[in-house]
Each structure stands twice: as structure tokens, then as C-alpha cells.
């Protein structure tokens, strides 16, 4: 049995860890509240974006009927090259949050490569970058400080290169993967085809749409510009949604760690009391033996 001093040091160490995990849980809780507020604002903006895109969809449907449709909406069932854009956290200590995304990306890579499709990776988040770099895989584009502090302009800048490669036919399809916020206790892996845009993702308005835009510029230019805004927003929202899920996962992980620490302290306290009792018993026996020897 370990001596009393060693056990006492262990108890102190575990208690310090418990204080840290409790503090991290509180910090994550506060950050989650702020991130959810951002998410609500983004969701409100999403409705407006969807209204705009619904008008676009109506125009695209008309163009599609005429047999001429832009590349951003032209579905490709057999892409030669696919870009996978994925979001992970910059930090750990959030349970299986990052690995859930990484496993999904790995599965998609295997599925596409089995079909003979070339896969290129675009990573937002240090954990994803570190994992696939360690696996020896090439990461076409990386951002290791974007997922922890989502910013619309930086999100648009990140996704810009992806969109340009798609427009220039360097890649045929863009998929986005991230672990999204479901509720305070759950996260959900989300996989979406970002490009080409599926008309099923938007509600097509009729000609009486409140956004019956009559552009002064060339209609194709307006369509491209609004499509770019839609893509930018989806990247930004993925970052916010992922960050909310990250804070939620970290709260759960820290709560579990705090609970385990408490159980460990209780276990060590019992061990300490037993060791202390054994030490006292040994001392008493030695005293009694000494007294008996003097008689």
C-alpha cells in the first residue's frame, strides 16, 4: 500500500484537475451561449438568403428548361475530382467531436477513390490538418485558426479558392463536412454537396416572388454573384454551427472528467483513510510490543 504522503499528493493533484475541468466547463458554457446567439442571427440571415436563392432557382429552372444551365447548378453524377471541405476544432478536450468528422471524411475519401475519383482536401481546423498531415495526405488548403473564431470575410476568403477551382473546372464537385450542433447534449455530422447547388435545397418561388429582381446588369453576372454569396454564407454558417457543437461537446467532456475526478478523489480518500488506520495500528502494536519487552 502506498504511503500516506504519496496518497495525499495524488488527492491534491486530482482535486486541482477537477478545478480545471470545472472551470473549462463554465468557460465552454459561456462561449456556447454567445455562439448560439450568432447561430440564431445567421439562421435569420439564412432565410433571407434562401428567399434570394429561391428567386435564382426559379430563373435557373427556366434556363434549365431551355437547355442552358450554369455550371454551379449542373449536376454531375460522375465527377472526376471532388474537393472535400471539412471543419474540425483547433483544440482538443472535446471528447469524440473531432474524430467523428475525421472518420466521416476518411470514409468519403475511400468511397470516392473506390470509384476512381480524385479527392482533394480543404481543412479548417488544426485537429483535422494535424491528423491527415500525419497520415501523409496532401491538404490542398488549410486554415488552423478559422474554426475557433468564425468570421464572415475570412470564411468567404477561404472558400473563394474552392469556388474558383470549381468554376475553372479544376474540380467537379465540392462537399462540405462538419460536426454540427443538434442540442445541448448532442452533435450531428453534416455532409452537404456545396457545389453544384442542388435545386432540391431551395424552395422555388413563382413569378410573383417578393424578390422578383429585374437586374440592370447582365443576368448571368447577377446569378453568379448571388450564388457566390450563398456559398460564402454556407461556409460561414458551417463554422458557427461547428463551433457551437464543439463547445457543447467540450462541456460534456469536462463534466464527465469532473465526475471521474470526484470519484477518483473519493477512492483515494478511502485508500488514504485505510493507510492511515493501518499506520496507527502498526504504531500501537509497536508501542505495546515495546512495553511488553520492558516488563
UniProtKB/Swiss-Prot annotation:
Gene Ontology CC annotations of this record: plasma membrane; proton-transporting ATP synthase complex
InterPro entries: ATP_synth_F1_ATPase_gsu, ATP_synth_F1_gsu
GO molecular function: ATP binding; proton-transporting ATP synthase activity, rotational mechanism
Compartments, record wording: Cell inner membrane
Recorded topology in the membrane: Peripheral membrane protein
Keywords in alphabetical order: ATP synthesis, Cell inner membrane, Cell membrane, CF(1), Hydrogen ion transport, Ion transport, Membrane, Transport
Pfam families attached to this UniProt entry: ATP-synt
Highest taxon listed in the record's lineage: Bacteria
The keyword Transport belongs to this UniProt entry's keyword annotation: yes
Keyword Membrane: yes
Role this protein plays: Produces ATP from ADP in the presence of a proton gradient across the membrane. The gamma chain is believed to be important in regulating ATPase activity and the flow of protons through the CF(0) complex.
Family statement: Belongs to the ATPase gamma chain family.
PANTHER family assigned to the protein according to its UniProt record, in alphabetical order: ATP SYNTHASE GAMMA CHAIN, ATP SYNTHASE SUBUNIT GAMMA, MITOCHONDRIAL
Assembly, per entry: F-type ATPases have 2 components, CF(1) - the catalytic core - and CF(0) - the membrane proton channel. CF(1) has five subunits: alpha(3), beta(3), gamma(1), delta(1), epsilon(1). CF(0) has three main subunits: a, b and c.
Name by which UniProt lists this protein: ATP synthase gamma chain
Encoding gene (name): atpG
Amino acid at each position: 500500500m502506498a504511503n500516506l504522503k504519496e496518497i495525499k499528493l495524488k488527492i491534491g493533484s486530482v482535486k486541482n484537475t477537477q478545478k480545471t475541468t470545472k472551470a473549462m466547463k463554465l468557460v465552454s458554457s459561456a462561449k456556447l451561449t454567445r455562439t448560439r446567439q450568432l447561430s440564431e442571427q445567421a439562421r435569420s440571415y439564412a432565410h433571407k438568403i434562401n428567399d434570394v436563392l429561391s428567386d435564382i432557382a426559379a430563373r435557373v429552372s427556366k434556363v434549365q428548361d431551355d437547355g442552358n444551365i450554369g455550371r454551379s447548378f449542373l449536376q454531375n453524377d460522375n465527377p472526376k475530382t471532388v474537393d472535400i471541405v471539412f471543419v474540425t476544432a483547433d483544440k482538443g478536450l472535446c471528447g469524440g467531436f473531432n474524430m467523428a468528422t475525421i472518420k466521416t471524411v476518411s470514409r468519403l475519401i475511400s468511397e470516392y477513390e473506390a470509384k476512381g475519383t480524385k479527392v482533394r482536401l480543404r481543412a479548417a481546423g488544426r485537429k483535422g490538418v494535424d491528423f491527415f498531415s500525419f497520415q501523409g495526405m496532401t491538404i490542398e488548403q488549410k486554415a488552423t485558426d478559422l474554426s475557433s473564431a468564425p468570421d464572415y470575410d475570412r470564411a468567404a476568403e477561404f472558400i473563394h479558392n474552392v469556388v474558383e477551382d470549381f468554376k475553372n473546372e479544376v474540380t467537379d464537385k465540392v462537399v462540405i463536412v462538419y460536426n454540427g450542433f443538434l442540442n445541448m447534449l448532442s452533435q450531428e455530422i453534416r455532409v452537404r454537396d456545396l457545389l453544384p447547388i442542388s435545386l432540391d435545397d431551395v424552395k422555388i418561388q413563382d413569378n410573383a416572388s417578393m424578390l422578383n429582381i429585374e437586374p440592370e446588369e447582365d443576368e448571368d453576372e447577377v446569378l453568379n454573384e448571388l450564388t457566390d454569396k450563398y456559398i460564402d454564407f454556407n461556409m460561414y454558417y458551417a463554422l458557427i454551427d461547428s463551433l457551437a457543437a464543439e463547445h457543447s461537446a467540450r462541456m460534456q467532456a469536462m463534466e464527465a472528467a469532473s465526475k471521474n475526478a470526484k470519484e477518483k478523489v473519493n477512492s483515494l480518500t478511502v485508500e488514504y483513510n485505510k493507510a492511515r488506520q493501518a499506520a496507527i495500528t502498526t504504531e500501537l502494536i509497536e508501542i505495546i510490543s515495546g512495553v511488553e519487552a520492558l516488563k
